[in-house]
């Protein structure tokens, strides 16, 4: 199987070429154009920007650890806040661990929601869009609640 070549005898294509609309009509092959020329330039540019920023503006690693001064509450990184909140608020620890494990299991089921639907527009896929919206709101709610004291963490201190 080779590169699809245009039929230059096609009158529609000849009309487009005459108007200057035929460039890239059939696309360019990824080999060798993209893989040998464009990708390395982008990768080297990204590495150069990262190294340049690291040299020009080095960030501090943080305060040195003090084993004799422990913070009152140890919080995980920000992206673990929702599952930390689940583990913190569920009284049964086994149930909390099972609920934490249900997060990736639920994420694995998302592609199979309405997978027979041929539409890519999210407004024409109501079930998947609703699941995404509810999951996003729940993750933000739990993430904000994880930063608050345990007493007002589920209500975010509003009630």
From Swiss-Prot:
> Among its keywords, does the record have Transmembrane helix?
yes
Q: Which GO terms describe its biological process?
A: mitochondrial electron transport, ubiquinol to cytochrome c; photosynthetic electron transport chain
In the UniProt record, does the keyword Acyltransferase occur? Answer: no
Lineage top rank: taxon = Eukaryota
The residues the entry assigns to the signal sequence are none
Sorted alphabetically, the keyword list is:
Chloroplast, Electron transport, Membrane, Photosynthesis, Plastid, Thylakoid, Transmembrane, Transmembrane helix, Transport
Q: Which segments cross the bilayer?
A: 35-55, 94-114, 130-150
Q: Which GO terms describe its molecular function?
A: electron transporter, transferring electrons within cytochrome b6/f complex of photosystem II activity; electron transporter, transferring electrons within the cyclic electron transport pathway of photosynthesis activity; ubiquinol-cytochrome-c reductase activity
Provide the primary localization.
plastid
The record's comment on protein family reads: Belongs to the cytochrome b family. PetD subfamily.
Functional note: Component of the cytochrome b6-f complex, which mediates electron transfer between photosystem II (PSII) and photosystem I (PSI), cyclic electron flow around PSI, and state transitions.
Entry protein name: Cytochrome b6-f complex subunit 4
